[in-house]
Amino acid sequence: MKPVERAKLVRSLRQESRRLRLLVLVIGFFLVTLTFVVISKPDALLFNLNGRLSVDHAPRSLLIRQRIHADSRRSADTFPAAEDPKVVDEDEGAEDATAKGTSEEEKRLLSSEPEQGKNEEAATASEVLGGGGEEDNKNGEEEGHTQHSKVTLPTVSNYTIRDAEDTDNGKQEDGKPNEKYEFEMDADKGDNVEPETDNEEWNKKPLCDFSNFRANVCEMRGNIRIHPNASSVMYMEPASSKREEIWKVKPYPRKGDELCLGHITEITVKSSKVAPECSKYHNVPAVVFALTGYTGNLFHDFTDVLVPLFTTASEFNGEVQFLITDMAIWWTRKYKVVFDKLSKYPLIDFNNDDQVHCFKHAIVGLHAYMEFTIDSSKAPHNYSMVDFNRFMRRTYSLPRDFVTALGEIPKAKPRLLIISRQRTRMFLNLNEIVAMAEEIGYEVVVEEANVSSDLSHFGKVVNSVDVMMGVHGAGLTNCVFLPQNATLIQIVPWGGLDWISRIDFGNPAEQMGLRYKQYSIGVHESSLTDQYPLDHEIFTNPLSFHKHGFEFIRQTFMDKQNVKLDCNRFKPVLLEVLDQLNQ
């Protein structure tokens, strides 16, 4: 080969070598970036650009696999104390837990086999709904617990009804500040049957299902250890099993709402071959869920807790043990009749318990779907809102199951309940509305619904009427007490809020077996005309304000607006309902 040709070949090879190195560098950078994203943000690859998880295309489960190289221990006093729920506008941030090294004695305990009933009588009592607890000299042993980075879930647009009159949290029902209560940690004393672990069908399933856009739920059958002090739920694997699962769950159905979930205790659900010794055996399933969040507002009491809890726990017919994180005593007292109907056992305060509870069946989190509804195609036993409506009527011993046709009762007048409000979205001409309704044949009842209302009394009032009406707000949640075929009329304030109103109360009412009417007010019926000129964009193009986010919508169209109903315009709605009641 000639020297000239050899030189050209060398230059060509050098160029190709540089290109190859550049290609390798680019590919390497891409792989490093992808690896970082997968490890640090496992959810990021599963959601579309607007941050919402598609209900139809969501994965069946999101598994976070990690190997545990070192045990650590979290002290119980590092968890935030359970407080009454507060609906807030600023994220207060959760305190970080402090990790401590695991002693040799604890390592020995973790690998030991449980001795049935050994520590049952000697276990320390904690605070649970029921009665005064007695303290013993033995403290429950804590599980070795590894701190992992929090799994950040995608932001989901969670619409919340936060009425001014429904945010008086931190109070008992009688308006007194919270007091310190002590409760007996004695879920089902005397249950000494050790859980069985042989369940091949459940062994094949992932422990948790993250596919639901609103709630993450973990369900296990077998040998399960719940250790509140370590905020952990352990599924005991056979020695031959190679499965390793670790999940991080906040058991409150507002998935993606970081403001709300910032106040919820995170629970680690994992498979394990070693665990702390059982100090308490239970023969009934466990359901673990949180209270702090948006509870304290009537709408969120139901859509975030009571409806999901009914969906999750009804199948057990009272034979179920509730373990509540972020306990709010005043709230559990308010809904004590509901808890008593769903469970025969005292509530366990998860954040103030030091025992190791052993179950054969456990559910962490609550089954939840769209706002204030049940998806019967996905719910256990195909439960529906008709079932929930029936459950609430029976729980509060309400007499009317169905609305009776007016023609069957001589001279009977249909009863109309008007939900009044005293702060925002008030009826400015309430007396005129009452007079008009009475003129066309209604017997009118006016009641105010707020956080301090006696739910038992209010439920009886609601159940006694044929029609309930009110401006969009949490008070309309009381429709759960209406008899079948009763009518709910929702007055929608100005501001393009028809779709929100339909989702929050229209769809749920119809799914409960109620008739539903929606009346959207006109510009002349809004008090906003006293604040803005008629040619203002708030009247000519109200939907343009929605781009500023829900907080702006709430402040502008809900908190600063009252309603002066045009009785001539609204009268045909009441007449139409009257005709339906006569059929």
Swiss-Prot record:
Positions of transmembrane segments: 22-42
Origin superkingdom: Eukaryota
One Gene Ontology MF term: arabinosyltransferase activity
Lumenal compartment residues: 43-583
InterPro entries reported in the protein's UniProt record: Glyco_transf_61_cat, Glycosyltransferase_61
UniProt topology in membrane: Single-pass type II membrane protein
Region Disordered: start-end pairs: 73-178
Stated name of the protein: Alpha-1,3-arabinosyltransferase XAT2
Species annotation: Oryza sativa subsp. japonica (Rice)
Taxonomy of the source species: Eukaryota, Viridiplantae, Streptophyta, Embryophyta, Tracheophyta
Gene: XAT2
